[in-house]
Amino acid sequence: MRITAEIKPIPLGRPRLNTTNRGRYLPKSSIEFREKLQWILRSAYSGKPLENSLSVTLHFYKPTKITAKNYGDVDNLAKAVLDAANGILWLDDSQIIELHGYKHKGEGKIEIEVIEND
């Protein structure tokens, strides 16, 4: 399966500590990104979540120079997508046995390729 999400990729933010409630929370930008990406994924894929082991390739496109400082680490970019796809494309990201992530300069989008292994 191949899905192109026309959304500017952002890395998953680190959980913050709330001293008032003594809890942890994700930054607002991470939550908004996840919700938008989930809506895109649900629109693009209406099947049941895949149940077997998976190989996933992710291509991240941003219109900025490719550096960790202004682009984010590829593992944090991938984690944001993998978490958003839980329960939509697959049951849980623990099913992924092979993962490839690539950063490119270009218009803001994410290309997701999922291969179900037997």
Regions found by a protein language model. Give the residues of each.
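Acidic, proline/glycine-enriched N-terminal capping motif
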Residues: 1-118
